[in-house]
């Protein structure tokens, strides 16, 4: 068992009120202890490491200067908020991060008053902080809205939509741009730090305000010239002309690890009479932990690790990860097909597109955190005869639903959607669960929706999608490793809308979609042992349904149970509709649907989440037995 680090100063800080009692000269020590504590905690739990280490000093400075929680602090995405959680009364639970019943890996309203807004998806912070700022302004309450957003999240249009509407908030809105990728900032040094303090100071802002008021009395051409001169001078010295055009007062860039620079700038902005303000800070992912500094990508999200060596504890996988199966399969297909290309929205390794990119870099497009653009870009490619694969996590595809409908489905364009992280995802919890894609995609005309039962099926579905030119097609697959089945040397083109019988029975039929197939087979074994002959079908397609197969099973079995790892409104709803339309429920057939419960499940290990959801073999058996004991009105029959 690892020994917890000595943190004498941090031990005295239970809340930001305690932090504000410290002398400025003590903040450097506090930041060092906070960083050590975070490394120790994440080493025991796993989680997001690099991003949190990069904002330790910034977190200390924000809580020192601003009056949180009255000032509403919103961390974009939220995976960098571990230091924030430690300083806001949750240190005693920090070693429960992402564990069952423990702290969330993101900010969460129900967890603390210091988390005024739940985050996990990117680029929402400015909109939320603007909402807080305007609400307080209208209500006459004190309190600012503060958004901390990374430069990666600034690639999403939503951030600019918020900034374009922010002027009404005035000095109540502060945006802190955490530039940890050096993609925006010029070199940071003593001069830029001096300029940041200068242009955010009270005297400078006062003089600037006087100059502006005087310039308004000038003839219009002179007034415009004065305005442009001010912007040009500040733009030459400081950068940030884009943000000024959006109505923000820009300050920066400043060193996000230098508390002595951060404190005076934050104080100046806090006390500024004008606004909104944007502070540009430059930080380093993994700051203060050598392994993370040396390999930021490998230490963004980590398993449990040895704090001394940085070595992560990873169990040896018995089967390849689903995203790698997809990426490698697509790369092989593209060797023979120059029209295949891959699109990812800032998740190349998470989706397996990095495998494709190594072989076909000219046909790989990482569009950044811009799912809406990714889908319509893919539609344009498809309209011109390319075969685009848009690889997106299920939870993030939600952000582009209108584009799927309007730009792809209505025009019947053959965009291929590779939907990763389908189903429950474990430690990332409700915000990242892929629960809804079948429900919202299978309602759309023209769209084909498949779900892979294992990694071999994923190979077949990737190949099938590549050859499907008559309209859009989607295939979903889960997070993690496959089940260990051999991968086919030659992929099979699946017949659209046709399922398969895995085992034949006569009394009970289990209709599975996706990776619950393994549990359905276990349940069939248990039902057979009870004398209930059970058929198991892998439907493969949520849309179009294999109507012939389902009709045949419904007319030859007493009980039909659909099993899926998606929300209400998915496969089960479509099967029930089909049965109703064809009059197959009129003769006493017992149909039951099993799907995820109608709630947002908290984080836990995936197998425990599915057990809680009632989607494992014992639950399937129980559902069948209850169906056999009841008639369609729910009245128990005389026989067991």
Curated annotation (Swiss-Prot):
Pathway connected to this protein: Metabolic intermediate biosynthesis; 1-deoxy-D-xylulose 5-phosphate biosynthesis; 1-deoxy-D-xylulose 5-phosphate from D-glyceraldehyde 3-phosphate and pyruvate: step 1/1
Binding site for thiamine diphosphate: 79, 120-122, 152-153, 180, 289, 371
Cofactor details (free text): Binds 1 Mg(2+) ion per subunit. Binds 1 thiamine pyrophosphate per subunit.
CDD domains tied to this protein: TPP_DXS, TPP_PYR_DXS_TK_like
Biological process (GO), any one: 1-deoxy-D-xylulose 5-phosphate biosynthetic process
Cofactor(s) needed: Mg(2+); thiamine diphosphate
InterPro entries in the cross-refs: Dxylulose-5-P_synthase (IPR005477), THDP-binding (IPR029061), Transketo_C/PFOR_II (IPR009014), Transketolase-like_Pyr-bd (IPR005475), Transketolase_BS (IPR020826), Transketolase_C (IPR033248), Transketolase_CS (IPR049557)
Residues at which Mg(2+) binds: 151, 180
Keyword terms of this UniProt record: Isoprene biosynthesis, Magnesium, Metal-binding, Thiamine biosynthesis, Thiamine pyrophosphate, Transferase
Gene Ontology MF terms: 1-deoxy-D-xylulose-5-phosphate synthase activity; magnesium ion binding; thiamine pyrophosphate binding
Keyword check for Magnesium: yes
Keyword Signal in record: no
Pfam families assigned: DXP_synthase_N, Transket_pyr, Transketolase_C
PROSITE patterns the UniProt entry points to: TRANSKETOLASE_1, TRANSKETOLASE_2
Transmembrane segments: none
Catalytic activity, EC: 2.2.1.7
Catalytic function, reaction form: D-glyceraldehyde 3-phosphate + pyruvate + H(+) = 1-deoxy-D-xylulose 5-phosphate + CO2
Subunit structure as annotated in this protein's UniProt entry: Homodimer.
Cited function: Catalyzes the acyloin condensation reaction between C atoms 2 and 3 of pyruvate and glyceraldehyde 3-phosphate to yield 1-deoxy-D-xylulose-5-phosphate (DXP).
PANTHER family per UniProt: 1-D-DEOXYXYLULOSE 5-PHOSPHATE SYNTHASE-RELATED, 1-DEOXY-D-XYLULOSE-5-PHOSPHATE SYNTHASE, CHLOROPLASTIC
Family: Belongs to the transketolase family. DXPS subfamily.
Protein name: 1-deoxy-D-xylulose-5-phosphate synthase
């Amino acid at each position: 068992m690892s020994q917890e680090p000595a943190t004498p100063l941090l031990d005295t800080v239970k809340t930001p009120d305690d932090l504000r009692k410290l002398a400025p000269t003590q903040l450097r020590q506090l930041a060092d202890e906070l960083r050590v504590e975070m490394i120790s905690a994440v080493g025991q739990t796993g989680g997001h490491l690099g991003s949190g280490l990069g904002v330790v000093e910034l977190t200390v400075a924000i809580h020192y200067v601003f009056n949180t929680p009255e000032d509403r602090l919103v961390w974009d995405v939220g995976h960098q908020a571990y230091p924030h959680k430690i300083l806001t009364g949750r240190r005693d639970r920090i070693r429960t991060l992402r564990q069952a019943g423990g702290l969330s890996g993101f900010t969460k309203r129900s967890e603390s008053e210091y988390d005024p807004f739940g985050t996990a998806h990117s680029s929402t912070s400015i909109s939320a902080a603007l909402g807080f700022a305007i609400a307080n302004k209208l209500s006459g309450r004190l309190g600012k809205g503060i958004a901390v957003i990374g430069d990666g999240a600034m690639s999403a249009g939503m951030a600019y939509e918020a900034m374009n509407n922010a002027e009404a908030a005035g000095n109540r809105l502060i945006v802190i741009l955490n530039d940890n990728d050096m993609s925006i900032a010029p070199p940071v040094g003593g001069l830029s730090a001096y300029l940041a303090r200068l242009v955010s100071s009270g005297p400078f802002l006062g003089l600037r305000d006087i100059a502006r008021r005087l310039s308004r009395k000038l003839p219009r051409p002179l007034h415009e010239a004065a305005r442009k001169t001010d912007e040009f001078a500040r733009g030459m010295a400081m950068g940030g002309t884009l943000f000024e055009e959006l109505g923000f007062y820009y300050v920066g860039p400043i060193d996000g690890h230098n508390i002595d620079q951060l404190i005076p700038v934050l104080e100046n902005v806090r006390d500024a009479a004008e606004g909104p303000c944007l502070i540009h800070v430059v930080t380093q992912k993994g700051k203060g932990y050598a392994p993370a500094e040396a390999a930021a990508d490998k230490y963004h999200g980590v398993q449990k690790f040895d704090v001394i060596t940085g070595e992560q504890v990873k169990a040896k996988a018995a089967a390849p990860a689903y995203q790698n199966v997809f990426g490698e399969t697509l790369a092989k297909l593209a060797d023979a097909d120059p029209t295949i290309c891959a699109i990812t929205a800032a998740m190349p390794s998470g989706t397996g597109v990095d495998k494709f990119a190594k072989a076909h870099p000219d046909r790989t497009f990482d569009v950044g955190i811009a799912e809406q653009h990714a889908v319509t870009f893919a539609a344009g490619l498809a309209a011109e005869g390319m075969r685009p694969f848009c690889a997106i996590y299920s939870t993030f595809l939600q952000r582009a639903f209108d584009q799927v409908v309007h730009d792809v489905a209505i025009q019947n364009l053959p965009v291929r959607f590779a939907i990763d992280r389908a189903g429950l995802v474990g430690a990332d919890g409700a915000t990242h669960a892929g629960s809804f894609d079948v429900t919202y995609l299978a309602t759309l005309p023209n769209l084909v929706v498949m779900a892979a039962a294992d990694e071999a099926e994923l190979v077949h579905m990737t190949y099938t999608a590549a050859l499907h030119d008559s309209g859009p097609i989607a295939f979903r697959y889960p997070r993690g490793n496959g089940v260990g089945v051999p991968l086919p040397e030659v992929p099979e083109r699946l017949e659209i809308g046709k399922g398969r019988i895995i085992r034949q029975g006569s009394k009970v039929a289990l209709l599975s979609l996706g990776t619950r197939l393994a549990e359905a087979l276990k349940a069939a074994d248990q039902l057979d042992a009870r004398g209930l002959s059970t058929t198991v079908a892998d439907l493969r397609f949520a849309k179009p349904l294999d109507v012939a197969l389902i009709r045949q099973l419904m007319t030859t079995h007493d009980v039909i149970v659909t099993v899926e790892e998606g929300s209400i409104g998915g496969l089960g709803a479509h099967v029930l509709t089909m049965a109703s339309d064809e009059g197959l429920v009129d003769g006493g057939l017992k149909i039951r649907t099993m799907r995820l419960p109608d709630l947002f499940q908290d984080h836990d290990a995936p197998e425990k989440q599915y057990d809680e959801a009632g989607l494992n073999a014992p639950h399937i058996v129980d559902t069948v037995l209850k169906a056999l004991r009841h008639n369609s009105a729910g009245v128990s029959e005389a026989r067991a």
